[in-house]
Amino acid sequence: NMVKLIYYRNFEVDMDFKRHIAKKLNIEGIGEDELVSMLALPPNTEMGDFALPCFKFAKIFRKSPALIAEEIAKSVPADEFVSEVSAVNGYVNFKIDRDFWAKETLSRVLSEKERYGSSDEGTGKTVCIDYSSVNIAKPFHIGHLSTTVLGSSLYKLHKFLGYTPVGINHLGDYGTQFGKLISAFKRWGSREDVEKGGLRALNELYVRFHREAESNEALNDEARSYFKKIEEGDKESVALFEWFKELTLKDVSKIYKLLDVHFDSWAGESFYNDKMGPVIEELEEKGLLKESEGAKIVDLEAYGMPPCIILRSDGASLYATRDIAAALYRKQTYDFYKCLYVVAYQQNLHFKQLFKVLELMGKEWSKDLVHVAY
């Protein structure tokens, strides 16, 4: 009913009632603050709203918890707050008057307004939240919606509870696809058409490249060459890449504005280009890096997982390498209390491998990394 909807459950209201119950209890040698901390929620709400376990009192009073609970229940009278007190299996159960609870809760809602339910539990704690992670030069699609909305909700909830959230859009802005896009643009595109068409025009160029490459393998070689130029800092190639990035962010920002979604960091895959060397060095120093069929891996067989590939046989880094570098950077930069990755459940294995590799590297904080799967 409506009363049940209203009274369940506000932390501050709970604390007020716990304090009231503790004041009513007169248990020798047990202070009010300790009683407040002992009062818990019963497993079944039909039994009561708060329960006091009496097992720790058995040694003090040399009686069974059940007998102690009965004696306490008899000694505590009901009042305008507490409508019923009962003893069950060593617990003292307290039922709060529903009308009073509803009035108390509504009073707080009216006085605190939009701050109702907030707390300062997260004061001084930073929580990194990795969500949305759009791909440069590709449109924002339905697949991005879940991670974007869930991540934004977690951001707002943590902020409401006093944490300092850091919203991170880990952009997909690295890979040979950008060499393909430069090749396609230089062959069939124009600045005027792309400025006018935005992401749609870029996507059309990308699709055309793949269509043409089916019968012309030389295009893939050309794309690899352009991507290498980006990596080497070639002015023209980097300028085109940055322009594609700018057009993408301009386009997706309209969607983020509609959804009321915000980010504090847009550091994507390319941001970690110069941060992977130290990761590989550390893995080697700690004896974690092994060679397998020309590739560099971390063997996770002992943990029931396939190997985590760090470097391909051609020396190229992989997704896992960048995510290790990103986790290290985020810990160093934000000293997070938790780091949440709001990513589809299909990536479960990737995150299990990532967290395990960081643990093997001796990063005690790896336990604070959480994959929020959906």
Model-derived segments and spans:
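NTP-dependent nucleotidyl-transfer catalytic core
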Residues: 7-11, 30-60, 64-374
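Generic start-of-chain signal for non-secretory N-termini
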Residues: 3-31
